Amino acid sequence: MARVKRAMHARKKHKKILKLAKGYYGRRSRTFKNANETVLRAMNFAYVGRKLKKRDFRRLWIARINAAARMNGLSYSKFMNGIKLAGINMNRKMLSEIAINDEKAFADLVEVAKKQLNA
């Protein structure tokens, strides 16, 4: 069987992982095995966190829209149904920004939604 020489590749891999583990406490930043486990775990947490961030922001936008809509006498679900019926195609992020920064414009949107629900 032929001899496999892989020192350069292994060193490159180890250096890459140890560089990623810089700043970790104790042996986690100095030995390849511990650093590798910690880096893989950290990358997994980062991956999951990127998915959770999308959910968290959507929940925040809905809570803001709901609060602003209720201040104008309409629940979130009725407000969203009303603007859909009115043909206003605006995402929740934009609606929440309008609710925070321009209360008069949001009140106008609520009035449009109310008219569509009553029609």
UniProtKB/Swiss-Prot annotation:
One of its GO terms (cellular component) is ribonucleoprotein complex. Binds directly to 23S ribosomal RNA and is necessary for the in vitro assembly process of the 50S ribosomal subunit. It is not involved in the protein synthesizing functions of that subunit. It comes from Clostridium novyi (strain NT). The lineage of its organism: Bacteria, Bacillati, Bacillota, Clostridia, Eubacteriales. The keyword rRNA-binding applies. Signal peptide: none annotated. PROSITE patterns: RIBOSOMAL_L20. InterPro entries: Ribosomal_bL20, RIBOSOMAL_L20_CS, Ribosomal_protein_bL20_C. GO terms for molecular function: rRNA binding; structural constituent of ribosome. This is Large ribosomal subunit protein bL20. HAMAP family: Ribosomal_bL20 (MF_00382). Keywords: Ribonucleoprotein, Ribosomal protein, RNA-binding, rRNA-binding. Belongs to the bacterial ribosomal protein bL20 family. GO terms for biological process: ribosomal large subunit assembly; translation. The keyword Cytoplasm does not apply. It holds the Pfam family Ribosomal_L20.
